[in-house]
Amino acid sequence: MKHTEGFLKIVEDAKTRVREVDVPHTLERLKTGARLIDVREDNEWERGHARGAEHMGRGVIERDIETAIPDHSTELILYCGGGYRSALAADNLQRMGYTNVYSMAGGWKAWKDAAAPIEGE
C-alpha cells in the first residue's frame, strides 16, 4: 500500500517518541512476559497473526487498553502490517501513561519474513 505524505508525516513524528524493536528482540522479550498486541484490522488478524499475540485494532486500542491491561508498566510490543499504525498507537499509549511500550519495526511483514511462529493462516 502506498502511503500519503500526510500520513507519513504523522508517523515520522510519532517515531521520534516511540522506541522500535526488531523481531528477534520481540521474540526474546516475549519469553520474559512482554505482551504482543496486534493493532491491525479484524480482517487482517483473521488472515493470520503472530502466535500468542492479542488483538486490539488500531481503532479501539486506546478505548480498550486500560481495561485489558490496567498496569501501565506492563511491557507492550505493538505491531501492524508494516510498523506505521503500531508507531501511532504506541505514541498514544505513551501519552496515556504507559511507560514500557514499543513498536515492532516492519510489523507483520517482518514477522513473516523472519519465519517467526504464526497462527490462523
Located regions from the model:
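Rhodanese-like catalytic fold shared by cysteine-dependent sulfurtransferases
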Residues: 1-35, 42-75, 82-121
